């Protein structure tokens, strides 16, 4: 099935599918390099107005475009990055030039970390979902 067929009528009620997350950046190359290290992916396209990474294991592309617009006071979205060792991942983000923002305590005693990339874009480091809630990873089986 090609992209056009999927977005016209997938049979599952979807309007479309998540192809990429595009982030405005004052320095797109710097942020692309940071996220390459976070997600263990590579830059696959680099133009004056666009830097795109290879897809992560979930199949989503991150891309960065230049922007001189002021940063909004409140973020309306941030990615959740699933990790197996949350404390190691927090430390690694800091080593790569990111920063720790805060810890969020969850209802069942777990926690996750809100982190920021070098330009202040927030992300959450989260622990894996329990098997009954997790969906198959890209490539493991049909989604």
What residues fall within each predicted segment?
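Intrinsically disordered, low-complexity regions enriched in Ser/Pro/Gly/Gln/His and often acidic
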Residues: 10, 27-28, 43, 131
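Conserved short beta-strand elements that form part of the metal-binding/catalytic scaffold
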Residues: 39-75, 118, 122-129
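Short linear motifs in intrinsically disordered
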Residues: 39-45, 82, 101-106
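Vicinal oxygen chelate
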Residues: 2-26, 52-53, 60, 63-64, 68-92, 94-143, ...
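Intrinsically disordered, low-complexity acidic/polar segments
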Residues: 32, 73, 88-90, 124, ...
């Amino acid at each position: 099935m090609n992209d056009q067929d999927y977005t016209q009528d997938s049979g599952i009620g979807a309007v479309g599918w998540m192809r990429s997350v595009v982030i405005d950046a004052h320095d797109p190359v710097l942020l692309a390099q940071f996220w390459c290290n976070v997600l263990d992916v590579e830059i696959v396209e680099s133009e004056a107005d666009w830097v795109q990474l290879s897809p992560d294991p979930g199949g989503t592309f991150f891309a960065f475009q230049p922007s001189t617009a002021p940063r909004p006071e409140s973020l309306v979205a941030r990615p959740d990055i699933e990790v197996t060792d949350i404390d190691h991942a927090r430390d690694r983000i800091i080593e790569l030039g990111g920063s720790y923002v805060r810890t969020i305590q969850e209802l069942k005693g777990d926690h996750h970390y809100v982190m920021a990339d070098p330009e202040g874009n927030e992300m959450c480091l989260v622990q894996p979902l329990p098997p009954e809630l997790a969906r198959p990873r890209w490539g493991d089986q049909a989604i």
